[in-house]
């Protein structure tokens, strides 16, 4: 079976989307993977070797020589890296400050279709995909590449909707959002099988897109539950800092610092690849209490989470951010469940992931930031609660989200399409 993965970001285990792909597909024997993506950043995984990168930089750089657009390569961890990846990182940081303008430029780059050159067509032909797996996202390359494959091959299309990106009430003047809505709907319409990350999303998207959706979220390679508690107590968050999650972690760091009261009774370690400004850096780095670390390989993150006492999932209470993530089921929840540590979720229960966390035995859910100090103090005063809760969550994970069960189910459903 040949599977072509089409995605926006590089297949990198250190970021959420890449980690999800590896969680699904690692250990699939007799399957050939290839990946098409719209960034210059290098991949980082043990599954896929063959790649084709079509970044906006490449399109504009070779605007008058379209035959040079795109980069096909075999991934080699020790090999040379793209000279444009550093430029791209700087461009993305600039784009965040001028989002509207850069979104227009980004969409126009792929609208030219100059990237559909002979190199691209040969890559698709050589991949000879039986199945295309893509995220249900508003990325223009994803939509246009899926459409090309649908029209020019016999491959079955499988889409996976993770983030709630559709905006039903977009203004008639908001052309950018209207276009995103169109891409999202068209990807679903072109799909032979659609997945969504939470049941609430499955139900709503069935009505929205007129297609049935199946529930799918990451599986757990489950560790044994904790038997001892560290001193100081270790809180760990590993994930992106988008959607004001940085603000929630800042509030948590402040609460831990208040409970510590000059002694190091607990500490918070944050691991993220998200770029932050000096204000956020200062908020998340409190001497003796909290530290923001750079992203680490997922295998290292798993070990860090296993060695922690309390693993975290957080969402913002800001109304605009709640709208953005209301149907999202964070991949961090399964990462937390597999760690063997106690799980804590902070956020409003109107968000699907927090609502789900409330149903996990042993998971402490904080729905009001004013309760943080008392919650932390209670855990410090009774360490056995951490052990007891870790055991409860571990039992639930083994019964409901075991990794091999998930992979076997996925492989079976993929084969059933052929």
Cite the ranges covered by each PLM segment.
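N-terminal subdomain of nucleotide-sugar transferases
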Residues: 1-76, 213, 221, 257-259
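Membrane-proximal helix-turn-helix segments that form the acceptor-binding/catalytic region
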Residues: 122, 144, 148, 152, ...
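Acidic anion/phosphate-binding donor-loop and adjacent secondary structure
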Residues: 167, 172, 207, 214-233
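Nucleotide-sugar-dependent
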Residues: 244-247, 301, 311-334, 343-355
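Nucleotide-activated donor-binding/catalytic signature segment of Leloir-type glycosyltransferases, i.e.
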Residues: 272, 278-307
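A charged, aromatic-enriched C-terminal amphipathic alpha-helix characteristic of glycosyltransferases
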Residues: 367-374, 384-415
């Amino acid at each position: 079976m040949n599977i072509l993965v089409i995605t926006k970001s590089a297949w990198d285990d250190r970021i959420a989307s890449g980690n999800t792909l590896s969680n699904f597909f690692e250990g699939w024997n007799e399957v050939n993977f290839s990946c098409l993506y719209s960034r210059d950043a290098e991949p980082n995984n043990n599954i896929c070797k063959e790649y084709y990168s079509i970044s906006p930089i490449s399109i504009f750089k070779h605007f008058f020589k379209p035959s040079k657009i795109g980069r096909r390569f075999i991934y080699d961890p020790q090999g040379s890296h793209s000279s444009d990846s550093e430029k791209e990182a700087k461009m993305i940081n600039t784009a965040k400050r001028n989002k509207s303008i850069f979104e227009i430029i980004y969409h126009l780059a792929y609208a030219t279709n100059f990237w559909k050159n002979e190199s691209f067509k040969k890559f698709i032909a050589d991949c000879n995909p039986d199945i295309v797996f893509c995220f249900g996202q508003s990325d223009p390359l994803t939509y246009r590449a899926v459409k090309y494959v649908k029209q020019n091959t016999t491959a079955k299309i499988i889409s996976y909707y993770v983030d709630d990106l559709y905006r039903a009430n977009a203004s008639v003047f908001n052309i950018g959002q209207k276009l995103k809505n169109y891409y999202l709907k068209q990807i679903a319409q072109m799909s032979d099988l659609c997945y969504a990350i939470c049941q609430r999303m499955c139900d709503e998207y069935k009505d929205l897109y007129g297609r049935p959706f199946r529930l799918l979220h990451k599986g757990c390679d489950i560790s044994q539950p904790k038997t001892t508690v560290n001193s100081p107590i270790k809180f760990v968050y590993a994930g992106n800092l988008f959607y004001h999650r940085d603000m929630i972690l800042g509030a948590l760091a402040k609460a831990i610092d208040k409970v510590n009261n000059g002694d190091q009774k607990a500490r918070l370690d944050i691991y993220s690849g998200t770029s932050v400004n000096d204000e956020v850096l200062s908020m998340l780095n409190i001497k003796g209490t909290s530290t923001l670390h750079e992203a680490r390989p997922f295998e290292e993150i798993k070990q860090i989470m296993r060695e922690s006492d309390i693993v975290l999932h957080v969402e913002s209470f800001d109304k605009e951010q709640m709208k953005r993530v209301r149907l999202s089921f964070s991949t961090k929840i399964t990462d937390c469940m597999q760690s063997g540590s106690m799980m804590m979720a902070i956020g409003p229960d109107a968000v699907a992931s927090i609502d789900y966390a409330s149903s996990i035995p042993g998971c402490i859910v904080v729905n009001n930031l004013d309760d943080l100090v008392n919650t932390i103090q209670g855990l410090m005063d009774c360490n056995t609660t951490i052990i007891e809760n870790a055991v409860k969550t571990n039992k639930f994970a083994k019964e409901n989200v075991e990794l091999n069960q998930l992979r076997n189910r996925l492989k079976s459903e993929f084969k059933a399409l052929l």
